Amino acid sequence: MQEKIQRAQGCLLGQLVGDALDSLVEFLPPQMIHKKYPNGVRKLEDGGTWDTIPGQPKDDSEMALLLARYLVKTSTYNAKAMQNANLFWLNSQPFDCGVTIASALLGRKNPNSQANGALMRISPLGILGTNYPLATVENWAIQDAQLTHPNPVCLQANALMARAIAEAINQNTDAKTLFIKIKHWAQALAVDDLLLQAIEESEIAPPKDYITQQGWVIIAFHNMLWQLQHAWEQFMALRPFLNNG
């Protein structure tokens, strides 16, 4: 049980640390990042794009923490309650908020957007999912994405990610086995061809371009799968995104 708790803690801390490190370089061109951080972005510091303090969450992690607090309180998921919580967060005037999320929370969902905002906040639901059947976790993850990112690609990416997190924490699944399970789940769910392509390509290469369509859920999903299979430690998994702003 203690090891399971540690895996859950590592998942949430990984989200928060990665997001806080990214705040130092978000939207900067790769050349500027390399000049400023020749050895990579490794230390939590103040400053950056949003002049944050060391370790301060950005919008994605603020929403993830909001979700985490609700799940700790209730031990279940309720889409209406999270819609209200997300509106509370938006009305708190966060220093940043994605366009897709802001529009959706103000009643103007964009069904064409394939942005990664829903995927970026889903880790707490995967953690809670260790206590529930994977089908339940999947359904909750889809409901949560539907609040802000109703495009089918976003819904399906959320479902696969939440399943993977719950499975990895609950079963201590090794990377190779987890990838095979993700591939099987994707086929069983008949996910969009873009996701299937990302899964196939992730076996042999990382995303070709992190910049041109920055914020696209397919790039985030593809990179996650590549790092799952090939990164030998945590910083190596974060480096591609951090080096590309």
Features from the language model and the residues they span:
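Structured, active/binding-site neighborhoods that engage oxygen-rich ligands
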Residues: 1-245
